[in-house]
Amino acid sequence: MTRVLLLALIVSGCGREPKAAVADSAGARLEAAAETAGIVPDPNAPLQGSWARDTDRICVGGTDKSARIGVSVDYGEDQGCTASGTVERSGDALKLAFGACRFDARFDGDRIVFPPEIPEACESLCTGRASLAAVTVDRISESRSEASTLRSSAGKLLCAN
C-alpha cells in the first residue's frame, strides 16, 4: 500500500509546469522601482553614447543591434590604443570587431567591460605596453552627437560614419 501511494505521488507530479513568476509580484515591482531610481542598472538601456573612466574612452553611435564603436586608451608617452569598428548587441553581450581584432565584451546598462584577455590580432591597435584588455568604462552621456566627437590622440574621429 505504501508503495502504491508513493508511486501515485511521484506520477501526480509529472507533467506539471512550474509556476511562472508573476510580473506583478512584489519582487518584480521592487526590481522595476530600483531600475527607475537608478539603483540597479537597466540591462535594456541604450548602448549609444559616450563612455569613460580615467583615460579610457569609448563612443558608440547607431542602433542598439549594430553600431559604430570607437575606443581610445591614452597612457601618454606613446602608450595607448586607438580602434574604430562595429559592435553588435545581444542582451548583455557585445560582439566587437575592429578589423581582424574581434572579441566579446559585457554590457550591464551602466558599464562596458572588455575581457581580461584579448586576441593577438588586437595588439596592432596599441603602442608601447598598452592593451585593450580589461578596459572598463562607465556611461557619461546617451547623446549620439557627443559620441560622434570622440577623437584619437592623432585627431581622427572614432565614431564618424
Enumerate the language-model features and the residues they cover.
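Sec-dependent bacterial lipoprotein signal peptides
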Residues: 1-12
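Bacterial signal peptide processing site
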Residues: 14-17
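Tryptophan-anchored aromatic micro-motifs
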Residues: 27-59, 146-161
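N-terminal glycine/threonine-rich, aromatic-flanked beta-hairpin/loop signature
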Residues: 56-95
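Surface-exposed, polar helix/loop patches in the mature regions of secreted/periplasmic/lumenal proteins
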Residues: 99-133
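C-terminal partner/receptor-binding element of secreted or periplasmic proteins
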Residues: 125-161
